Regions:
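Short, flexible cytosolic linker that couples an ABC transmembrane/permease module to its adjacent nucleotide-binding
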Residues: 1-11
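ABC ATP-binding cassette signature C-motif
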Residues: 10-243
Length: 243
């Protein structure tokens, strides 16, 4: 039995997706984001790379509405709808509620069988769907979050390191589901194959701002223009691109 992951947006995305202007954020005295400006367009699947993993997480938290920026702004297009997969999903689940009840909160259909069908895709069958959310393992929580995101049917997905708690079959299923996804994807992952198979745009956080290229990850790694920019950004101390 393999998981089945498919994200089917309920509405098509319009031409305005996301505009980020002069975004800055300092946490515990460290400037995590410094005057970041970006435009995200329809059809883009953007991988965020670079050694500063914290910057990626903070950016995702800000644009998903979980954290306020110190300066700057971001604007989602009117046709966009967002599902967010956080790096730490423990706060999403409380004890005393089972998986079916949890997903019911996000369902447009008032039907347990409809909700359970999404849990079934992630290999929760029968009475497993009544398991208390408070006792789920890390891998089980990830599978419930994926079921929730499929159920929501949104056209823009943010994934912060989704592959960390998944087995190989689940990673492959997620990979296939995101390849087929017709909306906009913003993500980061430590899995090279996952990044290269999905991304059509690479944004690298460097000590001197971002490098932004419309290309696959394997092409980015051998791009002479990127190499020159990285030399400048890392002042000759650059290693391999960190994902």
């Amino acid at each position: 039995r393999f998981p089945y992951v498919a994200f089917k947006p309920n509405r098509e995305i319009g031409k305005n997706v996301l505009e980020i202007k002069n975004l800055s954020k300092t946490i515990d005295g460290e400037k995590v984001l410094d005057n970041l400006s970006l435009t995200i367009n329809p059809g883009e699947k953007v991988a965020f790379v670079g050694p500063n993993h914290y910057a990626k997480t903070v950016l995702f938290q800000i644009i998903s509405g979980e954290m306020e920026p110190d300066e700057g702004s971001y604007t989602w297009g009117v046709t966009t709808s967002l599902s967010y997969f956080p790096k730490d999903n423990s706060k999403m689940f409380g004890a005393g509620i089972n998986m079916t009840e949890y997903l019911q909160e996000f369902s447009k259909e008032d039907d347990d069988n409809y909700v359970r069908s999404f849990l079934g895709r992630m290999l929760f069958s029968g009475d497993e769907a009544l398991k208390d959310c408070g006792v789920l393992s890390g891998g089980e929580r990830v599978r419930v979050v994926l079921a929730k995101m499929m159920l929501e049917g949104n056209n823009c997905l943010i994934f912060d390191e989704p592959t960390s708690h998944l087995d190989l079959e689940s990673i492959q299923a997620l990979n296939n589901g995101l390849i087929d996804f017709k909306g906009v994807l913003l993500f980061n992952s430590h899995d090279h194959q996952f990044v290269d198979s999905l991304a059509n745009r690479i944004i690298e956080f460097t000590p001197k701002g971002i490098i932004d290229k419309m290309e696959r990850f394997d092409d980015y790694l051998v791009d002479e223009d990127v190499k020159a920019k990285r030399d400048k950004a890392y002042e000759g101390h650059k290693g391999a691109v960190v994902i």
